[in-house]
Each structure stands twice: as C-alpha cells, then as structure tokens.
Amino acid sequence: MSKVSGANETLQGALAPLSHMGGGGDATLLKDEGQVELPRGPGVLNVQVLPEEGHAHLQDLEGYKSMDPRQSESASTDVSEMLQHTASLDDPIQFTRVSTSSVTSNSSSDPRESGDTQETGSRRGCSTEEQAPAGAERVSGQDQDSWDVEEVVAEPRSGIDVTPVGDVTNSTIRASGRSAESTSHYLDEYSDTRYSSSSPSSGSRKLSTTIITPEKNVVAQALHCYADNYESPLNDLMSSGDERSSSVRETSFENASSDTNANLNGGRASTGESMRSPPPATGLPNGFVHTQASAPALPVLPAKSPFRAVQSPFSGTRKSRNSANLAELSLPRTSTSSASSMEQRKSRGGRMKVVLSSFVQNIRRNSQGEKRRSGTAMKISTPYNATHVHHVGVDSRTGEYTGLPEEWERLLASSGISKKEQQQHPQAVMDIVKFYQDVTGTSGEDKVFKTFNVSSTNACELSSSPSFKTPSLSSITRFEGSHEAYNSAYHSPMLQSPMGFHDPQHDEKFIPSRPAPRPPGGAAPKTDFTSPLAYDSQSATATPKNQRFSNQSSGFFSLARKATLNKNKQQLPPIPSAAAASAPITQPGSTANIPYIKPAENPVSAPSKSIPPSLPAVPTPPPPIEKDPPLRDLEREREREHSSAKQGQLALERKREEKRRRNQKLQAKLAEICSPGDPSKIYRNLVKIGQGASGGVYTAYEIGTNASVAIKQMNLEKQPKKELIINEILVMKGSRHNNIVNFIDSYLLKGDLWVIMEYMEGGSLTDVVTHCILTEGQIAAVSRETLRGLHFLHSKGVIHRDIKSDNILLSMDGNIKLTDFGFCAQINETNLKRTTMVGTPYWMAPEVVSRKEYGPKVDIWSLGIMIIEMIEGEPPYLNETPLRALYLIATNGTPKLKDADSLSPVLKRFLSWCLQVSPNDRATAMELLYDKFIVEVAEANASLAPLVKLARMKKLAEKMDADSDDNRTD
C-alpha cells in the first residue's frame, strides 16, 4: 500500500482527511466494487488497507478514482482540479503495473471477511499523531514543497511468479522485475508504513499519511507506535522493494483521471546516489513514480531531472501509450532506517544466488549438449590384436579337461599320459601344464625350450669334463644376488638381492639331461682339437650343455649299457614354444627334424609386435552412402598400425639401448673381476677337449709349475646371460673347499672370457655310472664327498639346485668335487624358500615340479636320485617323455627301485631318508653325514680310481668304434 507524505501540506481542494469509519464502512465500499475499470498497465496499488474501520472511503474523495475492480462508478472529483495550479513537467512519470488479484485472493474478496476491523483501532491510535492538521493551507503550484511517494513492492517468498495475463484485476506492483505474491506479505515487511485520517468534521476529505523526516525522534516514535499495533496482525504481509536500497520504500500515486495528468513540482533532496531519468512508462492511463532514498536528507539542489530512473521489468512494447501526457513528480529522498546496509547485503546475496544458479544451469546444459553431440559422433571400431585366453579346467562329471589349447591336447596325447591317469590325478596334470606354460612363457632368447637332449651333435663327438661347459641358452637364469665380495663392488640391478643373487622365476630353464648314444647307422663327425689361439668363429657353434665328453687320452673301447641304448628310440613331444617355429627341435643324437606345434599368439609376451595379424573385415554394403564408414575405419586402422609400428620401433630401440648399457656394465664388472694379461703367455700346450654353446674347453699346463689346468673360453657376444658367468665365477671364488672345483683365475681378452679352473682329468660321474657298476661302499664314498660339498654350500646359504652325475667331477686318484654353479642360488633369513623352476626334471624334487616353495633340501632329493642313478645306471623315468616324467614325479612321490631286494637295509634306509616327499621329513646334509651308511659303509676315495680309469677306456673305445664306422661309410 502506498502512502503520500507532505510537509504539513495537503492537496488543494481535493484531498481531505480520512474519516474514521466503523465496520459499516466496509459494506459501503463493497457495494460499488466491480464497477471500476482498472487500467491494464503495469502498476501496483494495495487496496486492502484502504477500506479500514474509522477511515473515509476513497470513493468519497474528490478527484479520486478507486482501484477496486468492483467499483462501478468513478469519483466525481478529478485530480486535475486538485492540481490545477501545479506546473507541468516534460518528463513522463515511471509507472509500474498494479495488480489486485493477488491482493484480493490472499486477503479476502469480501471486506467483511478481510479482518480489517481487527486493525482499525490500532491504526487509528498511531496515525493521529502524524497526520496533517485539518486546517492546513492548500498547496499551490509555486509554493508546494516536495511530496514523498512511497511504493509498497511485493517480493514473492516462494519464488512463484503470478502472471497478470488474463486477469483484469491483476495490478500488483512489480519493482525491479519482481512479481507479487500476496498482499498478506506486504505490510509485514513494510512495518514503517502508516495510514492516518484527519478529523471527520472537516469540510473536505484529506488524505494524510506519515510524514517522513530525517529527524530521529519522529522516526523512532513512529516505529515504536507501529510495532505495538501492527506487527502482529501484519506478519505475513511483507515484501522487498528496490534491491539496492530497501530502507525507505517509495510509493507512487496514480491519478484517477485517465485524460488529465497533474504534475507536482518540487525539489529533490540529494542523497549521494546517481540520479537516473526514468524511461517513459507506457500502457497505463495514469502515471506512477517509483523512487527510493537510502541516505539522510541533504540540502536541496537544483535538479536537472526530478525523478530517479527505475528500470521497468516489462519490455518496451508493453509500456503505456499515454506516456506523452504523463507528468513528473519531484520527490525528495530521505532515509528512515539504519538497517539498510543489512538489507542491501541480503538483497545482493539473493541476486548473487540467482546469477550463480543461472550460470551453473547454463554450464550443465552446455555440457550435456556436448555429451550428446560427442556421443552421437563417436564410433567404436572392431577389435584388433585380439587373443584367445584359454582357461584350463576339469569337468567334474566326465573327468576330462576343458579349455585346453589344441597343441596342449596333442602334447598330452603324445606324452604317454593316458586318459585314466589324467582322471586319477587331474591336479597333477594341471601342474604339469602350468609347468610347461612357465617354461615357454618367456620371450626372445629365453623362449627356446632346449631343456632336454635336443641336439644334432653326437654324444660321442667331444670329450670334456662337465665343469668346462658354459651355460647354453637352455641353462639361462638369473640370481638373486652374488657373493659378498661381488656384492660390495658391483651393483647391477640384475644381481642385487639381500644375499646378492638375482633369480627371477620366469628365466629358469631345465638343465639338459643325459644324452643318448648316436643313432644306428649314423656317423659321428670328426673333431679337430686345436689351440684356442687358432680358434675361429666356426668352432663356437651352439652345442647343448648336456654333451658327455670323453678324455682324449683314453684308448680303450667299451659298450654302453643297454638301458642307455634304448634312449635313441624315443622322441621328444612337440613343444609349444615360439622358438619352435624358427628352430625345429631335433632328436638327441640325430639331425632329423621333429614337427612342431605352432603356439597360440600371445601379444603380451611379444610387446614389440606392432602390426595386428589381420585387419578387420570391411563389409561391402549395397548403398553407396555406407562406404564412407568402412573407409574411415580402414583409415583409422592404418593410423593405428602406423602408430603401433612407431611405438614398437621405439620400444625395440629402448630395449637395445638398455641391453647395450647392461652389457657395458657387465663388461666393466668383468674387467674388475678378471686379471690383466694374455692367458696364452701364461699357459702352454692348450688342447681343445670340448665345445660349449658359447665357447670351447681346453686343457693346458701352467708355465713354471707344470700344473694341469682347465681353461673355459667363452665368447661374450654369444653368451645371452652374462650375469650367469659372473655368478659362477664369484661363487667359485668364494667357495674354497676340497669338494668344490677351485677357481684359479680369469682373463678378459678381445671380448672373450677365459676362466682358469682346477682340472679334473677323471671326467664326470656320468662316465662312471654309465660304464661301470659301483658297490655300496663306492656309492657311500661318492655320497659322502657330495654331502660335504653340499654342507659347505648350505652353510653359505647357497642352494646348488642341479645336483646330478654330470656335475660331479672326479680326479684320476678318485677325488670328488662339485662343479657347475651356474644355477646355484643363495638364500638368507628373509628368503628361506624359493619357487623358481630350475634343474634337470629327472632329478627334480616334487616341490619344485609342483611349484611350491623349496629350500636347501631339494639338493638332498637330487642326491637320492643320483644314488639310484649309481645303482641302476640311470635316473628314474629317463626312458619316459619329459612331460610324463614330471607327471610321475608329482604323482608317485618316492620312485621305486627295480631290484630293491638286492640292496642292504642300511642303503635302503639312507635312500628313503633322502627321498621323502615332504621336505620336513627329509634329512639335512649334516644329518646324512652322520648316518650309518656314510660312517660305516663308505670306502676311501682311492677305491674310485679304478672305476675312473675303466670309464675312460670304455669311452675312448666307443669313440674309436664310431670313427671306424665313419671310415667304412665314406
């Protein structure tokens, strides 16, 4: 509701004080409601507060036109008569829309039910103190002071905007673009609004409202009076006005005449705010001015424009058509509240919330639109580099394996493991499959399954001690550390560990097993024994590590045992490795190629492969419009191939660079380990007695002492795992023992490594067990010396992991020493168990085959198998295929002897203690050294000397027989 405040002045001849009315006043006002034609322009007038008890009806005022829609008759007196002496201004008055629909809907359409009678008394008591005197002088156009027009502006609390469309009574005031909700909220917010009436005895009715002055006592008195009388009944009638200054609400007064516009001329108080000219309001027959003030009154200055501009919430098309005839009211702006700053902050906070909410919604809408656009444009190509992963399982109903690759099925079929055995021990077969997967799962050089006798060279071709053999591709491994001396000087990542050895599981391979004799009718190639100084590159051809060498000085002929002769009849099963495609596997002792099975492609094991095996098939759609997507797919595929090729090339270059740096570090470390000089000037009479995968083995005599030594020459370029060599050298350097082959010295000459070791001219134990029969005393002697060497290694935390007859060397006087430490590994307190797959499968312990943790007792199991080898001439399951041998080791546990009744109980007890399936029940090296079989039955080492000589003569006889056969064939 609006109120008009004049400085002790009233409107001339038109306005009179409102008379106090009782309840009957409401009925008088209601009867004429509905006959008034409200303007359709945007304006606000709160009509609820007019028909109050004790106040004069507005319809009785002269020149006042009621805003009630039910008012049928207009007032008799025109406002133009009231303002006939006032000067006209050129600037139009700013109008806002007036809506009464929200007022009448929320309060009451019937004044009798509106509850106005409850507010009349309190209003009457408060307003009489502030009303203008009845006999005040009338205002002339020249002497008129400023009129303060306040506007009650409704701000919806619930955020619901009441549209004025279609409602002829909708004339709620809207300021700053806000919609009105209900009149019930107006007076609650504007608690400083006062309505008063003059004495009813006055001749003419006057509209007197609260005088707004900058004096603090008047404002405080008015607020106090209103708080006592109006705060309670008007709690719900609040609204916010202008957001920038809400301390003083200014109202606009509408002229009742639609064709006569009165202009009020007055001064405007400067408030420190920039004054803006209001835009012309159109669409209203009468003008409203909406101004505000938020600062105390200051001295009046000449005003260029008497109105402060208020932006209309309506578009320009809805402005009043009569704006040209509107006059402008000059209104002073004053401040009546000290709480304006707080309300300003609240208003600014609300505005900021609206801005931020709109900003967030726009961002969300844009992001959703981008997602929809990107989702429609995205296309998924067909898979490339696809691989099929096999999951091997066992059918519980049929007992058959499911998910086996085709090559594995053929491997099992050729391994000799029957269906019945597979059904009886499915888990064991699964372990064997995993075993093969682990062995063949590596890539590159390590993906060569040369575990067993897969050589095209005759077993009788060369003769040498196994200690002179270099590790081949099949005997490649890493170790989790090195010796203490090596660990303190060298810090290669591949050789670091708590104890120095680095031993990743996936690099472990089988050690070659016993070779088979040459096939019938096959001629063994002749061997030329030359000095290493005249050694050329052709002499470094790859020869398997399992070659048995005979001494050149042997001139006796002998025949191999029958059991060993049968080994040439068996062929290895096809091996599912990638190397099989490029290097066909040959039968031991023959040159015939064995068909291989092409393994399933595994891109994980070959990351350098950049081009997919095949491009996805491009369909040929009949419509021409569908040709573009396949072309785009092909283009993308080509781009992927190109990028993959680049990535693969970069990866290959990085790998080569890393390998080069690693080789440089290994070369530097070898240079530190090796002694400077030329071994050809220190040793004389070098004679080649054997050939390894990466070099040859020679015998020589030291100049000055005439001591016989063995020289192991290795071409480092052909040695794929140089850390193995370093490991073996360091282990031998730190293992000075009577039962360990002693390391003498090493040299690095022109890229070749020369290792000088103690020479065991008697050869290996393999020559003895294959050509001679040992007694229990001799078996006990060999076991004793082996146990002493193992006890020494185990005390150092070293596991040999490859105890077999090939790695037991004898001298001519019968002394026994361990050799071939290329596969040894160290353990410590933090790593007491190992899980790597290493060693020769026929001598493997069950825990190794089953991929369980193991410790030093795996060497004790291998010793037990070696004892069976000394008893029967070969290890158990040697005539079986390797896969079936592993299966039998895992399922049978302790192997059975062919003629156990011929053995003494002491030997059987000792053997049973070594071959316990459970490592916890298996004996240690120290316990076995105190066993009765070792203490009482073992003979002296000299008892082995005749066997060594006999084995050498038989081996030489076999070689001479082979040479004669070759001559007859030629």
Swiss-Prot record:
Residues 613-624 have a biased composition (Pro residues). Its EC number is 2.7.11.1. PROSITE patterns: CRIB, PROTEIN_KINASE_ATP, PROTEIN_KINASE_DOM, PROTEIN_KINASE_ST. The active site is at residue 802. The keyword Nucleus applies. It comes from the Eukaryota. Transmembrane segments: none annotated. Residues 98-109 have a biased composition (Low complexity). GO terms for cellular component: cytoplasm; incipient cellular bud site; mating projection tip; nucleus. One of its GO terms (molecular function) is ATP binding. Residues 683-934 form the Protein kinase domain. The keyword Nucleus applies. Residues 380-393 form the CRIB domain. It is an enzyme of class 2 (transferase). Residues 1-42, 86-185, 236-284, 311-351, 499-551, 592-663 are annotated as: Disordered. SMART domains: PBD, S_TKc. GO terms for biological process: bipolar cellular bud site selection; budding cell apical bud growth; cellular response to hydrogen peroxide; cellular response to starvation; intracellular signal transduction; invasive growth in response to glucose limitation; negative regulation of gene expression; negative regulation of sterol import. Residues 625-644 have a biased composition (Basic and acidic residues). Residues 1-11, 168-185, 248-264, 312-325, 536-551 have a biased composition (Polar residues). Signal peptide: none annotated. Keywords: ATP-binding, Cytoplasm, Kinase, Nucleotide-binding, Nucleus, Pheromone response, Serine/threonine-protein kinase, Transferase. It catalyses: L-seryl-[protein] + ATP = O-phospho-L-seryl-[protein] + ADP + H(+); L-threonyl-[protein] + ATP = O-phospho-L-threonyl-[protein] + ADP + H(+). It is found in: Cytoplasm; Nucleus. Disulfide bonds: none annotated. Belongs to the protein kinase superfamily. STE Ser/Thr protein kinase family. STE20 subfamily. This is Serine/threonine-protein kinase STE20. It comes from Eremothecium gossypii (strain ATCC 10895 / CBS 109.51 / FGSC 9923 / NRRL Y-1056) (Yeast).
